[in-house]
Amino acid sequence: IYDTRRIRKGLPLKDPKTGLHYYTSGYDYTKMNNGYRGFQGDFMSNGIITPGREWTAKLTEVKYVYRDVNFESFYSRVLTLKNKCAFTNLADIYDLSYEVLRNGVSVEKNQVAIPSVLPGKTCDINIPYTTAVDDKAEYVITFSLVLKKATSWSKQGYEMAQQQFKLSAENVAGTSVADPTFVQKDHGKLPAIEEKGKLKVKDNTITGKDFSITFAEDGTLANWTYRNTQLVQPNAGPDFNGFRRIANDNVNLGATGGVAENENKEEGALTGKKMMVKAPKKQGKNVVVETAVTNGKDTHQIAYIIYPNGTVDMKVTTNNSSEETRKIGIAMQFAPGFENVEYYAKGPWSNYIDRQRGSLLGLYKTTVDGMFEEQSAPQTMGDRQGLRQLTLDNNSTKLQITTEGMVAFSLSHFDDAQFNYDVFYGGKHPYDLVRSNQIFAHFDFWQRGIGNRSCGGDSCLPQYMTPTGA
């Protein structure tokens, strides 16, 4: 939606303070409908591109759904394609290329010819990749169909469809990375940690070579420095966080899954009652700490193991009593300066448990600001599924996070609390948000499916509901 007063030469203007566009949405015109939100709100701003005609994560998913070819299977080096076109032979319009990735890094690329594939028919294509696949790394193969010739709407070589499959040393049928269950499967164990060196414990402070970690009395990780560099914002270590605000979530559920949206204060979703279960104590050469957060019926625990070399091992255990819970995970704030981001997960656009088929597993480089999504109505954003490894860099110090099990993450310079506003009558815009220097990070076991119904609630499918129990 454009406000014509904020357009110059056909382009939307930007706010000089934030650099963000002056986009408006249906929420800005509620008064024109006598104060009733019907057919205003996000009915007026929920397209698959932005008002400035820019690409979005939604468009990535829609492109996957509407493609005219199916990658049926990949087994024993044979790719099976199905032509979904009504009149066109695949061989007439597409070239096929493939790329092998080892832990997200490209190790082999090539191109093969597509045989004649009539409409509605399938074909088998031998893929002669030469990479030796072993159990020491994660291997996937990415297939891409690109245009043979330029068209009136696209250049030659434009990628029209893509699909990834996991490779294994056993040469069994490759699991499709597009399958939502892919990120729910175990992707490997954390490596063993060497225990060389010594640690000192005084009160709730653990000190090792070049680093220091302090816990508050309630179990909060209050301070973490490495070579005099602050890694975590003071008193903002890992804490339970179940908050999510998406404008078209079910109005009657709100962000927590149990409070009317226009009355939702969110305190219960943001944290709970904290406690130190086990104060810092030496265990061999290491130090162990256990903390917990109780939120209503649910208790969430973090068991820390701190090693002499500075590695911190966190085992997060959660308990959830409602499938309507919006998120199960932890939030924390990294210190200012760690702007450079490298992550091994599904990307490069944001993706969710029920909207990730168009996203590819890979090693991506970006910045925290680069992960911000300029949505017409500010809301929870930026999730990436299947996190394996994340590295934050402030140009002098690198902080690396490696995961085991199912983890999704997001990074932002904007506090989630800013999304806790009256969506329908608040009229907030991205340029209204206050940017902080620190980095707000989320690491989630599960985020409830976004759903896909424009009226009467989100209609989240059963398999994407938040699992209950421990």
What role is predicted for each listed range?
Residues 1-76, 84-92, 97-106:
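Extended substrate-binding grooves/exosites of carbohydrate-active enzymes
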Residues 55-94, 179-208, 316:
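Surface beta-strand/loop "capping" patches
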Residues 81-85, 100, 129, 145, ...:
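Hydrophobic beta-strand positions in extracellular immunoglobulin-like domains
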Residues 88-96, 110, 154-155, 323-329:
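Short, hydrophobic/aromatic beta-strand segments
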Residues 92, 100-112, 158-159, 457-460:
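Short beta-strand and strand-turn-strand segments in soluble, beta-rich domains
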Residues 99, 103-153:
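Intrinsically disordered, low-complexity Pro/Gly/Ser/Thr-rich segments with frequent PxxP/GP/PP motifs
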Residues 128-136, 149-151, 168-470:
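Beta-strand/loop-rich accessory regions of lumenal/periplasmic or secreted enzymes
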Residues 152-165:
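Edge beta-strands of extracellular beta-sandwich domains
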